[in-house]
Regions:
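Beta-rich, aromatic/charged-enriched effector core domains that present basic-aromatic interfaces
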Residues: 1-89
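Conserved catalytic cores of very large enzyme subunits
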Residues: 92
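Conserved, aromatic- and glycine-enriched, well-ordered alpha/beta core segments
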Residues: 241-251
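Gly/Thr-rich phosphate-binding loop signature of adenosyl cofactor/nucleotide-binding cores
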Residues: 96-101, 105-226, 241
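Alpha-helical support elements that line or immediately flank enzyme active sites
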Residues: 235-239
Length: 251
């Protein structure tokens, strides 16, 4: 409010102040650790031997209702991209809470350090895998942020990791949601770079010689999931450089 342009960083800092998230100082108006973000500490790459022992993600055997829906989708949308044979996402509140706690306990401590890192054949790494549960209202963003902050105060996760994760939720997720409610439906039709190329057909198959794109697309088709850095810096960035018409990416 009152600014000439929309920027996530302004929104993020205001939300931190308003809700008292990772704030300190006598008046509670200073960022914990003396800085608003820890991007410099959160850009490490894996060594030559790879990510090592990454904790297994929480998986859930599809129940009867989920199996029924899977069968329906396979019958009615058989020609659509993607597969359902490895579906193991949380579909209940209880399962979502298990996924959240597993992330906090096992992957949050290293999330920040490696949040921008990728490795071939490793779709899960130290990410939370909670986006679907949040979007389906199985988890509340406020409670997710609170649990992560509590882990920091308990000494179970370092500040750079917790701040990096909080920024993904309270920053990016809520910022984009805010843009949706303030600028849609017109925002969906914007094309500031006047881009008009078609999205390559192999985006729907993963059949490309470009390794990073192939890996990101293949896991998206297999699991319905790609982490934020794959979407931003691999599939999204390539489409941007190619000049793809925006609606072909998000339609």
């Amino acid at each position: 409010r009152g600014r000439k342009s929309l920027r996530m960083e302004y929104f993020y800092r205001e939300m931190r102040k308003r809700h008292g998230v990772l704030m300190s100082g006598e008046r509670g108006d200073a960022p914990e650790g003396g800085q608003w973000n820890f991007d410099e500490e959160n850009r490490e790459a894996f060594g030559s031997t790879g990510p090592g022992g990454v904790p297994a993600r929480a998986v859930f055997e599809p129940d009867a209702l989920t199996r029924e829906v899977i069968a329906l989708v396979e019958a009615r949308f058989a020609t659509h991209p993607g597969r359902l044979d490895s579906f193991a996402w949380p579909v209940t509140r209880e399962q979502a809470l298990v996924s959240l706690q597993r992330f906090i306990n096992e992957r949050l401590p290293l999330f920040g350090r490696y949040q921008d890192a990728m490795w071939p054949g490793e779709p899960w790494l130290h990410h939370s895998h909670l986006a679907a549960a949040l979007n389906l209202k199985l988890l509340n963003p406020r409670e997710v942020v609170a649990v992560a902050v509590a882990a920091y105060h308990a000494g179970a996760a370092p500040l750079p990791s917790v701040e990096g994760f909080v920024r993904q939720i309270l920053g990016w997720r809520e910022y984009v949601r805010g843009i949706y409610w303030t600028r849609m439906p017109g925002y969906a039709g914007l094309n500031a770079l006047d881009a008009h190329e078609d999205l390559p057909a192999w985006y729907w198959t993963g059949a490309t010689d470009m390794a990073c794109l192939r890996d990101a697309l293949a896991q998206t088709l297999a699991h319905g999931y790609a982490n934020h850095i794959q979407r931003l810096m691999v599939t999204g960035l390539y489409a941007l450089m190619l000049g793809v018409q925006p609606k072909q990416v998000h339609a």
